[in-house]
Amino acid sequence: METIDLKGNAQRGLEAFTVAYDAELAKQYFKEDYIQHNPGAPQGLAYSLQMIPMMKEAGTTTETHRIFQDGDIVVMHNSILNAAPFGGDSFVVFDVYRMEDGMVAEHWDALTPMVEPSFGNSQIDGATEVTDLDQTERNKALAQRAVTDLFVNGKVETASQYISEEQYIQHNPMFPDGFDAFVSAMETMKTQMPDFKYVKAHHVWGEGNFVLVAGEGNNNGTAMIIYDLFRFDDGKIVEHWDIIQPIPAEKANDNGVF
């Protein structure tokens, strides 16, 4: 039985919109009734197809910086340029696709404007190679525990159990590299942003050294989507990318963002 290239199909599906600008090609990779969790997009493929002429006119393009697979889930770390149809100049986005029969059947995402780095690392650069496939389940479990201990429960004293003290590369543009900087940032947030809460991790998707945790937060009454991408090495987090996105009160579909 021929194995379907799910990562390839997910990427080709995205590029049908942002490289080929081809609705008929997109229909080959997206189910007509695919489940949409983006709060700004209605359910199904029809709305997305309507965006193609606007993307073509704007010259909207995407680039995939990281891609990995967890069963029928494909995770992509993308950038969007010339992104006027999406309400800005450029964005960084995590796109998560659930594949069925080789086609996209469900989609989650989180996006944030691309900004200039404050401490040297951009929101998209860094390691890309998926390695340590035999460590997938271990790393997923570690990521789940790290988010629970550090972000949900605020146990900064447990940081050394999860974060490498030798190398920690930070891609959040607000914070510098390093274990000490991570601990300092956590302490600062606890004192200066007491109304920011990480409520719950809803999904943990991973392959090898990469794990994406999709979680829910709340900032002074505003619900938030929080996606954290971790790269592990020898059981410790050595690199981190993230996106925090407010959840609008009015949503274009009834599927929920998680």
Question: Where are the regions a protein language model picked out?
Answer:
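C-terminal and inter-domain tail/linker signature
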Residues: 1-258
